[in-house]
Amino acid sequence: MSVEILNESGAEVDVSALSRLSRFVMDRMRVHPQAELCVKLVDEDTIAALNLKWMGKEGPTDVLAFPMDELRPGLMTEEPGEAILGDLMLCPAVATRQVDEARAQGQTDHTVEDEIDLLTVHGILHLLGYDHAEDEEHREMFALQARLLTEWQGTRGSGALPDDVLTGEVP
């Protein structure tokens, strides 16, 4: 699997760990070994501009997914084909703010690294065709996201997920 991580955010992020996580998720989701993924870490101005241009929403967001091939969940065959998953745009500054706000409210004890991991898994699932616009889709996607994160954390022995991530509750 080809995973390219580009850190243009100025934030200190373990790009090697992010690459390993991306490969782990792609492997668990049975993505073709020659599939391509690009994860770009960007600043708030960059992600805000992309959010406005592509989503019609003002302001920065935590993650945006730009799928290349039209993949859909549940359509994986015994031998999944080669694919270009697409691009993920992650904003470490927004992730940091989300963690700080959740901690201030006593809602989480996970780290910024855990949040970036969560956003990476979330984005890859979007690239694979998962969505959370409807309640049932939300439950399915967030349950899968929680399972993948739990498995990943078991491989590296750290991290604490908030209850809503583990349960897939609809906010």
Predicted segments — roles?
Residues M1-D117, L128-P171:
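An acidic/histidine-cluster motif and surrounding catalytic segment
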